[in-house]
Amino acid sequence: MSLMVVSMACVGFFLLEGPWPHVGGQDKPFLSAWPGTVVSEGQHVTLQCRSRLGFNEFSLSKEDGMPVPELYNRIFRNSFLMGPVTPAHAGTYRCCSSHPHSPTGWSAPSNPVVIMVTGVHRKPSLLAHPGPLVKSGETVILQCWSDVRFERFLLHREGITEDPLRLVGQLHDAGSQVNYSMGPMTPALAGTYRCFGSVTHLPYELSAPSDPLDIVVVGLYGKPSLSAQPGPTVQAGENVTLSCSSRSLFDIYHLSREAEAGELRLTAVLRVNGTFQANFPLGPVTHGGNYRCFGSFRALPHAWSDPSDPLPVSVTGNSRHLHVLIGTSVVIIPFAILLFFLLHRWCANKKNAVVMDQEPAGNRTVNREDSDEQDPQEVTYAQLNHCVFTQRKITRPSQRPKTPPTDTSV
């Protein structure tokens, strides 16, 4: 059966719905997308059509956008794996399940499911003001911005199947942005967020997702304690260990430094004194700062305790001088080794060249006895001429023979 026939059957249902009140309403199927309606270009998505009456045959139709050839002349059972998706797959889908009690043989159309394809434009940026750690009951502003002039933005939280939140972008010369105020903050609102951008004439073709932004609600549990070993004052270049502990049964501890976005995370360990503790090794330390730690549970990774009291870590010594010294050493030492190696090779090559340039033995007449007498008295001097080492044999004037050597050549 062609898609056109199935679509006409679905439309025909509405024309005949009056005489058939028992068909439709609660009998219409339910269409869902797994793992979600936001799909990266090149990935797959499963469309599943469920009927309350247990019928497992269904057809799919796409209401807008470009047609999808793989839907034509197809009757599906239970589910349909669609992909690798392209921008052509973006749009609104419905399904009709087989229905023997309907005059058309098909149920009413299902709920609409909008498939949005990401990766069509470059990604925007997502920020949180005043920051991603939000006290319970307070408000945070999520700002999505881009140098592309997007008329629409979508805000999506990972792990939920609901459609992304659609927001109207504010255009300006440098691009576009949108601000979304979220609160009062509760654990239900915390999570990992991403945003997307789109243009008006292609609303379901989205940009690549922004980098993930973790929104954390803090202040739900009692604060842990933070200490430094061997102490909060550290010599530049040395190591320090920050210990976060509590009698609460926290699974994970988080360590953060003021004015920094990132955080360190370690699993809590039960100590003999009955506390749950995590030790964060830091170093070599070059800069100080105020540190805090938080506790959380694995079941609620975005719900943290109150922060510990701030622990100021100070660094003594000239850290800048330490950096300069280390950097200079890294440059000078390899250069000195290379220079020594090249100079050694140069001298060896020069010495070989001097030996090769000596006169052949046949052109010189040397008395063996005279030569033997002169050898211990010969002195080798190294002369530096224009940074080049040459060797010369010089006979001391006081030791020169008074009579020329006898010519023994024939």
Curated annotation (Swiss-Prot):
It comes from the Eukaryota. It is found in: Cell membrane. Glycans are attached at residues 179, 239, 273. Residues 344-410 are cytoplasmic. The chain crosses the membrane at residues 323-343. Residues 1-25 form the signal peptide. Residues 26-322 are extracellular. Its main location: membrane. GO terms for cellular component: plasma membrane. Disulfide bonds join 49-95, 144-195, 244-293. One of its GO terms (biological process) is immune response-regulating signaling pathway. The keyword Disulfide bond applies. It is a single-pass type I membrane protein. Residues 42-97, 137-197, 237-295 form the Ig-like C2-type domain. SUPFAM superfamilies: Immunoglobulin (SSF48726). Coiled coil: none annotated. Keywords: Cell membrane, Disulfide bond, Glycoprotein, Immunoglobulin domain, Membrane, Receptor, Repeat, Signal, Transmembrane, Transmembrane helix. Belongs to the immunoglobulin superfamily. Receptor on natural killer cells. May inhibit the activity of NK cells thus preventing cell lysis. This is Killer cell immunoglobulin-like receptor 3DL3. The gene is KIR3DL3.
